[in-house]
Amino acid sequence: MNIIVMKFGGTSVGNISKIKNVAKIVAKEIKKYKIIVVLSAMGGVTNKLQKYIEEIGSNFASENDLILTSGEQVSVGLLSMLLNKMKIKSTTMLGWQVPIITDSCHEKAKILNIDNKNILNSFKTNNVIV
């Protein structure tokens, strides 16, 4: 099984039309590969969330991480929905579902290990993991 990783930043997923374009790009590679898609939050979302955190004045790094990752989760869900609507079997995975093991340094964590068993199992029934 050949697997590729495709990464799209905030500008590439800035609105639904752009997410549809990403889905088309992914669809072109489906015949050759199983695909892992990594997405940023939609353009401007992370900045907006950061402003909310600053307004509250939070010094709680774990909550900051939780809030900031919500932007990526929206993009991931929307793309997976579009791919499935296009009849491309897709599922979503968050870091803890993979799992990706990091150190405990919130906001600046380093990856210690990626256990790929869940990814490989998911590819038995899906063509794309977002």
Residue ranges and their predicted role:
Residues 1-130:
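Nucleotide/pyrophosphate-binding catalytic subdomain
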